[in-house]
Amino acid sequence: MRPSTGRNDPCPCGSGKKFKHCHGNAAAPPSVGGAQATPLLIQAQRLLVQGNYGQAATILHRVVELDASNVDARHFLGMATAFGGKIGDGIERIRASLHAQPNNPLFRFNLAFWLGKTGSVGAAIRELMQAVAIKPDYHEARYQLVKLAMERHMHALAKLHIDVLLAVEPENPELHYRLATALLRLKEHTAMEREFRTLIARAPDNVELHMKLGEGLRGTGRDDEARAEYDTVLAIEPGNPDALYELAFLEERRHRVEESERLAKQGLALQPNHGFLHLALARVRRRQGRMEEALEMLRQIETANVGDACRVSALYEMGAILDKLKRYDEAFAAFDHANITDRKQFLDLETGTFYSKDANKAWFETLKDFYTRDRLAALQSYLPPPTSGPQPLFIVGFPRSGTTLTEQMLSAHPRIHGGDELPGLGLIEQHAAAQTIQNLEPYPACLAAVPQNGKQDALFKLRDFYLHIAAESRAVDPEKLHFTDKMPLNENHMGLMRLLFPASPIIHIVRHPLDIVLSCYTNQLYHGNACALSLDTLAFHMVETWRLVDHYIAEMDLRYARVRYEDLLNDPEGEMRRLLEFIGEPWDPRCLDFHKSVRVARTASYAQVAQPLYRSSQERWRHYHKHLEPVIPALTPLIEKLGYSVS
């Protein structure tokens, strides 16, 4: 079956414009899109636009036979072949034309389109990035790049190109919506809120805008304001099931289980097949201890006609309940099914993988090569330590290692404010460093240009950028000396921490690696380029992360303390006293009453940290030993190095 030309697809004429902006518009003039304008090519192009792909291909074959050097004809033949249904053959022909003209941005744009159609989104993004590098004003390519980047959760990349497009079209509402969504995913909360409120002012009855703003407010712990947005949705659309689900989730997170149940039932009475409302009710049943009822609800979701997002959430929930019931083999089967399903959204069909070991290994090596003792000393000579205002207290560690518990305990101290997971260091890596230094090299190489290009003030700007993001995220209390940043895998940024905040404490939480691997695999986590969606990639990423940490410790004079999660559970007062002494703060017994805090954790650990300390999470991996056996050999050296055992 041949694909039809959608209004947002590239025009078959090869102009590089969307169909709706070219021959999809009745007023659009004929164009050869840069081709050698022979009569046969013009005729073939008209046939392409009309959807007569077979006839167009026949003519283009003839042109190529007459002149094999006609690269445009070879390219359009690839387009005709792909539009005619033979996408693989079409891609190969387009690649061949690109090989002949590697700096042709149109050819790269069209190749990216078909790669995206076949699911090779990563390759498509790379082609589009090259297209706009060759032709910076190629806005159609940049639009497509933004779209694909957001589909792949590459929101920093998307934001970078949205900013370029907004400089050309500052009033484009679609771009502002995409910007707001990217800011939401990047946790740039103040800018996100500003964008959504501006959009809502123009379209006050747009339900999707209120839902997204509610999500953003919920993500900052502003539950009452989030609730107001969902209530607005219900005023616009009474009984809106998505709003009722979000309200039910808010109530469950606040441990108001009866109200959560009422809202879920209200929604199901109106839409009995809404998968997420069944999920909300199943969570309530789990909280109430009615496990078999919850499992039955979740099994119905698993087999119902719902999207993958709902099915995956239900499978994780099912696994959690089966784990509580000590039905470990069934639990692992549910978690395994969830991860296998969830991988599909990240799968690059060209490589057949969702996570590239080679690319991630190369990134770790890049950081090691850059952050050396000599280079850090040279860069720090341009940046005196900060002297005023609240400063970051970095809590680093792999996801599910105990960073949330540590932060909750420390933030109960009257001089420490809980900042949660802050995106600032990641944003510096992804785009802010290169933009601030105005260097074409990506991070960290762009930092090397600071002394050469007279950009010494750029380091001050990067530090201010981080503090600005922290303030926008409401992580900073001016009355307190410290604010925490517990973004998972921030240990990758220890070199950047040492450069920008040399006096800031770094608290590294470690836990038995097998417990971390199991806990990551049994929760829906996308940190570390979605490494947690497979046991093999999880183990690989953990080992490589520790190699990077060892490099940082060897190359830098860090203000660094390591805490074992198990020690924190077994001797909380002793470990907290040691940590506070390391930070330079006096002991305060409120650190042991963290579970009484009104502050809500916004991570997968939100239920656990609302309780006093419990030790059931220690050595949980033993229940799943046979399922973890494939990764034990890779992890054994790290396990032993950290003082743990597999015996």
Task: Give each language-model segment a name.
Residues 1-12, 20, 24-474:
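Alpha-helical solenoid repeat scaffolds of the TPR/TPR-like class and their adjacent stem/linker regions
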